């Protein structure tokens, strides 16, 4: 039955505009009850009227006699209904014995991808930070001015490309950057954890459970670790892919290895409505606008506990200013000279190409620390020379270097280098917030 509204839309909107969602919902539900009581009274009056007089003219509905003078706006009604659905969802969650962790705004509570992420993160031992995922407008690329700076950065790289293949790859990114239009608003949040906290395992579990999501690996060398997980690509693969793709959720592994503009370009290319970044914020470098941290994506889940190594490594990290808790098995850190005999280990690491070449001269194969972020080994030998100081002075890269092992870390360095390594800082380094990339033109500042 239609009935006249007893309350003015404008008055209700004015009343609830300064309330939070719960207060507004309680207030509006109370008014709904009052309106229903009024409806019942009117209905009874109409029934009595019909009994007394069968004349159709006299038994018109109350709404026909007195048409509504003030309808609610569609937006107001939609928001009101969302509040009601949210409250009903929260009540159902409480009845099942647990309270729903909210990652999104009221519009997104109970949405399947966010619920899966929440449940799996808590199950993996991650703590909810109390923050919700941040909503970004579809044109954030333009509003942040990253798009112009990234365009000039790619143009410079294309001009300096050393081969046709590299030039074509950069050109492909430029074409997409200039042709792709804003697709949709999106939510973004970060899952941050110390090395060994279980980020990759969590990511795999989330990706397996979601229906329309893609997992992007910043380190392409990790692709073998994701065997059996659907829709897994490297960031570079997806950026260069000519096949149109669309995913509701975009998950990025080791996001600190990506660039801020790459994340925005990928979101636009895929039309993703939810973007979740997985990584360790301590392993990122925020001194350049290329860092994803300049997007200010909130951390929604975090973990300071490592299951990879034990207390000795945790103490060693703490001595260098890194805070984490070692909950793994027995581990060991040993010191040795750069030259001479040392512990036999699964892999050798170093910081620079020069040190890598120096080791190759004596038939010692080594990998750069920057190439193994996200990977783990049973035992590691880390070779450090004095000439490596500009690189190992970066605390983010140093943390990667000393957390790749599970049982044994052998640091091979001469005594004078050891002191520099333990107390290294980036002297004179300045934050560069007006340009994008290592090399830029003077007119790049916006």
UniProtKB/Swiss-Prot annotation:
Binding site for ATP: 193-200
Cofactor: Mg(2+)
EC number: 3.6.4.-
The keyword Transport belongs to this UniProt entry's keyword annotation: yes
Keywords, comma-separated and alphabetical: ATP-binding, Host cell junction, Host cytoplasm, Host cytoskeleton, Host nucleus, Hydrolase, Nucleotide-binding, Transport, Viral movement protein
Signal peptide: none
Catalysis: reaction(s): ATP + H2O = ADP + phosphate + H(+)
Gene Ontology terms describing biological process: transport of virus in host, cell to cell
Domain (+)RNA virus helicase ATP-binding: from-to ranges: 160-303
Recorded GO MF terms: ATP binding; hydrolase activity
InterPro entries hit by this protein: (+)RNA_virus_helicase_core_dom, P-loop_NTPase
Chief place of localization: host cell
Chain segments carrying region Disordered: 40-60
Localization per Swiss-Prot or TrEMBL: Host cell junction, Host plasmodesma; Host nucleus; Host cytoplasm; Host nucleus, Host nucleolus
Top EC class for this record: hydrolase
Subunit structure, interactors included: Homooligomer. Interacts with movement protein TGB3. TGB1-TGB3-TGB2 complex formation is enhanced by ATP hydrolysis. Interacts with the suppressor of RNA silencing (via N-terminus).
Protein function: Participates in the transport of viral genome to neighboring plant cells directly through plasmodesmata, without any budding. Multifunctional movement protein with RNA-binding, ATPase and helicase activities. Engages in homologous interactions leading to the formation of a ribonucleoprotein complex containing plus-sense viral RNAs (vRNPs). ATPase activity is probably required for vRNPs movement complex assembly. Intracellular delivery of TGBp1-containing vRNPs to plasmodesmata is facilitated by TGBp2 and TGBp3.
Protein name listed in UniProt: Movement protein TGB1
Organism of this sequence: Peanut clump virus (isolate 87/TGTA2)
């Amino acid at each position: 039955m239609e009935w006249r509204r007893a309350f003015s839309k404008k008055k209700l909107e004015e009343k609830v505009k300064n309330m939070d969602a719960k207060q507004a919902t309680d207030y509006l539900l109370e008014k709904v009850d009052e309106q229903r009581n009024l409806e019942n009274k009117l209905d009874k009056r109409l029934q009595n009227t019909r009994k007394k007089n069968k004349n159709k003219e006299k038994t018109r509905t109350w709404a026909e006699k007195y048409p509504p003078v003030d309808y609610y706006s569609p937006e107001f009604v939609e928001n009101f209904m969302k509040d009601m659905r949210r409250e009903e969802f929260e009540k159902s969650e409480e009845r099942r014995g647990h309270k729903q962790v909210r990652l999104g705004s009221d519009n997104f509570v109970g949405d399947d991808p966010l619920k899966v992420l929440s449940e799996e993160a808590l199950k993996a031992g991650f703590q909810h930070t109390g923050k919700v995922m941040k909503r970004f407008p579809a044109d954030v690329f333009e509003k942040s001015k990253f798009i112009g700076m990234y365009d000039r950065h790619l143009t410079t790289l294309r001009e300096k490309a050393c081969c046709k293949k590299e030039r074509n790859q950069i050109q492909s990114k430029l074409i997409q950057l200039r042709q792709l239009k804003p697709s949709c608003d999106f939510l973004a949040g970060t899952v941050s954890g110390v090395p060994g906290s279980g980020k990759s395992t969590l990511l795999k579990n989330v990706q397996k459970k979601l229906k329309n999501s893609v997992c992007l690996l910043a380190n392409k060398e990790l692709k073998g670790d994701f065997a059996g997980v659907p829709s897994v690509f490297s960031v570079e693969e997806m950026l260069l892919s000519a096949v149109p793709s669309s995913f509701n959720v975009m998950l990025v592994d080791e996001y600190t290895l990506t660039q801020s503009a790459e994340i925005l370009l990928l979101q636009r290319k895929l039309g993703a409505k939810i973007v979740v970044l997985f990584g360790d914020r301590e392993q990122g470098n925020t001194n350049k606008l290329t860092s994803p941290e300049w997007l200010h994506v909130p951390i929604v889940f975090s973990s300071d506990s490592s299951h990879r190594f034990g207390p000795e490594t945790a103490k060693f990290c703490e001595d260098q200013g890194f805070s984490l808790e070692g909950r793994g098995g027995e581990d060991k850190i040993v010191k040795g000279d750069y030259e001479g005999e040392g512990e036999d280990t699964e892999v050798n690491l170093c910081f620079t190409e020069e040190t890598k070449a120096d080791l190759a001269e004596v038939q010692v194969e080594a990998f750069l620390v920057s190439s193994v972020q996200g990977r783990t080994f049973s035992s590691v030998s880390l070779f450090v020379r004095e000439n490596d100081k500009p690189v190992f002075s970066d605390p983010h890269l140093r943390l990667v270097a000393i957390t790749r092992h599970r049982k044994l870390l052998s640091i091979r360095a001469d005594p004078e280098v050891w002191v520099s390594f333990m107390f290294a800082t980036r002297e004179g380094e300045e934050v560069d917030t007006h340009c994008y990339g290592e090399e830029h033109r003077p007119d790049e500042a916006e």
